[in-house]
């Protein structure tokens, strides 16, 4: 059960996340907070529940972390998919996992729109290839960008959009449309949707499926093709399926830890 804190009492947070009065804190590590959360007023106005997480031995934490890191490092973007069908239930589980992502003001400003219809996939491919043809062949994509993509061997041909059993388009909701026709502002929309996209990719990888983050530019045609409302804008497109047997991917090297992680131990 969530606790209601007594005004004027200085509370600490125990190892299990529970708020404790001073007399209860002798045998736990303590963090001292001048302003407990939730405040008594907030807890009285809105529901709160206890967040209980088992604290594992550090050796087990490290073992889990390394196992997850090894599995995550095996993930690769795939451009050749098997046409074998993928049950809708697997996509639903991935979307539910993605929707556990933190979001600005808990607005969850995203919609995952999926299709396995051959006609819809063909229309998406045709429109995407037209945009990419302009990008690659008419130099809407500048030389520096094309040079960066050269090791990946990408071009305007997007056959995977028809071969993959599913196409999932993630839309960001720029604002909320309420049932009465009024609108409400959403916050940190791109940041929130990006986090959800990462969890979606990770969930697919965890269950043995492959995907590719595909962003034909511009992507406005997707809102029209998929019949989405004005408040939604396409964020990224995912072909989803099993990787084709024998598929090859670029032999790339990811950045080392010291290239992506910095610890700061004093003010600058």
What are these regions (language model features)?
Residues 5-19, 31-60, 236-268:
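C-terminal helix-cap and adjacent tail motif
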Residues 12-16, 41, 113-193:
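Glycine/small-residue-rich phosphate/adenosyl-binding loop
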Residues 46-54, 69-83:
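Generic N-terminal amphipathic, Lys/Arg-enriched alpha-helix
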Residues 93-98, 174-225:
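Small-aliphatic-rich amphipathic alpha-helix that forms the alpha element of a beta-alpha
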Residues 97, 151-156, 222-224, 247:
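Glycine-rich, charged/polar anion/phosphate-binding loops
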Residues 99-106:
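Glycine-rich phosphate/pyrophosphate-binding beta-alpha loops
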Residues 133-141, 227-250:
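A glycine-rich helix N-cap at a beta->alpha junction
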């Amino acid at each position: 059960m969530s606790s209601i804190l007594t005004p004027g009492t200085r509370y600490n947070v125990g190892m299990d996340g529970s708020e404790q009065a001073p007399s209860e804190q002798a045998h736990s590590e303590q963090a001292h907070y001048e302003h407990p959360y939730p405040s008594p007023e907030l807890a009285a106005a809105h529901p709160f529940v206890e967040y209980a997480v088992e604290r594992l031995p550090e050796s087990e934490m490290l073992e889990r972390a390394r196992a997850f890191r090894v599995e995550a490092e095996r993930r690769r973007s795939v451009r050749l998919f098997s046409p074998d069908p993928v049950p809708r239930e697997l996509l639903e589980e991935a979307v539910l996992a993605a929707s556990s992502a933190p979001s600005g003001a808990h607005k969850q400003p995203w919609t995952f729109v999926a299709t396995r219809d051959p006609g819809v996939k063909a229309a998406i491919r045709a429109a995407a290839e037209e945009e990419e043809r302009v990008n690659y062949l008419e130099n809407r994509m500048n030389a520096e960008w094309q040079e960066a993509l050269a090791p990946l061997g990408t071009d305007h041909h997007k056959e995977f959009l028809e071969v993959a059993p599913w196409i999932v388009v993630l839309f960001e909701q720029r604002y909320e449309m309420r049932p009465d026709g009024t609108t409400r502002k959403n916050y940190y929309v791109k940041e929130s949707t990006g986090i959800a996209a990462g969890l979606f990719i990770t969930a697919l990888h965890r269950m043995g499926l492959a995907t590719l983050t595909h962003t034909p530019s511009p992507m406005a045609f997707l809102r029209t093709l998929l019949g989405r409302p004005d408040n939604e804008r396409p964020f990224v497109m995912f072909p989803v399926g099993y990787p084709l047997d024998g598929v090859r991917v670029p032999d790339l090297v990811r950045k080392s830890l010291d290239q992506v992680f910095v610890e700061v131990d004093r003010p600058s």
